[in-house]
Amino acid sequence: MNHDDPNASGVPHDDANDAAPASASDAARATGHADDESSPLHLRRIRSFVTRAGRVSTGQRRAIDELGPRFVVPYDNAQPDWDTVFGRRAPRVLEIGFGMGASTAEIAAHRPGDDFIGVEVHEPGVGALLKLIGEQQLSNIRIIQHDAVEVLEHMIAPDSLDGAHIFFPDPWHKARHHKRRLIQPPFVAQLAARLKPGAYLHCATDWQNYAEQMLEVLGADPSLENTAQDYAPRPDYRPVTKFERRGLRLGHGVWDLVFRKKRAG
């Protein structure tokens, strides 16, 4: 879940039903099979969200109706021609779980030469980002309202992304829920395969335990290398959200991790 809206659904991170398959940017996809991480089905059980109800405002609904046909790319089991979708060839960045979209819009506005694919399942967030796209006249964002794991599998070609952002995914802070976190070895391997050599993966979290897990998992992937000794300074392009600023005032930490895909040789 992106910190644009720390709890847009009204459900705290771990207060959702324990049987729920996942979270707004994390977790394990239930299939009815045994929970065996060595199984080839394990990656398919990873899901990037848990279904939560959320009210779509009048303005968000209007943005969906008016701007959705241009800026929302329907999920498909085939890879679109992204150059055609954006109307140009430019560096392409994937953001998984953009929340209410404020950070996504701000980054896109400051990086007009890059194109951004935002993946979010929750309709209020989709509507909120579309509203910002309209207000700020942004042309370099497209949205897919679907599970990020399936989007990666079917809609993003290997070695095609110049960057990926995963900001403040749900931490699932209870130990019994850690298996639901998004940043797990199978998912990271899948995402890394979609990055071009030299492309970056930027994760951020305000949960130290999750930051430690991210550092371990990302560091163990043989195709990735850390750009820092451990945690990275916050890159200038990532905005500090109101929620994050409040946490920092209260003494809470925020950890950024920036890895790059290794080049051949």
From Swiss-Prot:
Binding-site residues, substrate: 174, 206, 241-244
Gene Ontology cellular component list: tRNA methyltransferase complex
S-adenosyl-L-methionine among keywords: yes
Catalytically driven reaction(s): guanosine(46) in tRNA + S-adenosyl-L-methionine = N(7)-methylguanosine(46) in tRNA + S-adenosyl-L-homocysteine
Family annotation (Pfam families): Methyltransf_4
Pathway: tRNA modification; N(7)-methylguanine-tRNA biosynthesis
Listed Basic and acidic residues bias regions: 1-16
CDD domains: AdoMet_MTases
Annotated stretches, region: Disordered: 1-40
Transmembrane segment boundaries: none
Catalytic residue list: 170
InterPro entries documented for this protein: SAM-dependent_MTases_sf, tRNA_(Gua-N-7)_MeTrfase_Trmb, tRNA_methyltr_TrmB_bact
UniProt-annotated binding residues for S-adenosyl-L-methionine: 95, 120, 147, 170
Low complexity compositional bias, start-end: 18-31
EC code(s) of this entry: 2.1.1.33
GO molecular function terms listed in the Swiss-Prot or TrEMBL record: tRNA (guanine(46)-N7)-methyltransferase activity
UniProt keyword annotations, A-Z: Methyltransferase, S-adenosyl-L-methionine, Transferase, tRNA processing
HAMAP family associated with the record: tRNA_methyltr_TrmB
Similarity comment: Belongs to the class I-like SAM-binding methyltransferase superfamily. TrmB family.
Role: Catalyzes the formation of N(7)-methylguanine at position 46 (m7G46) in tRNA.
Protein name stated in the entry: tRNA (guanine-N(7)-)-methyltransferase
Organism this protein belongs to: Burkholderia thailandensis (strain ATCC 700388 / DSM 13276 / CCUG 48851 / CIP 106301 / E264)
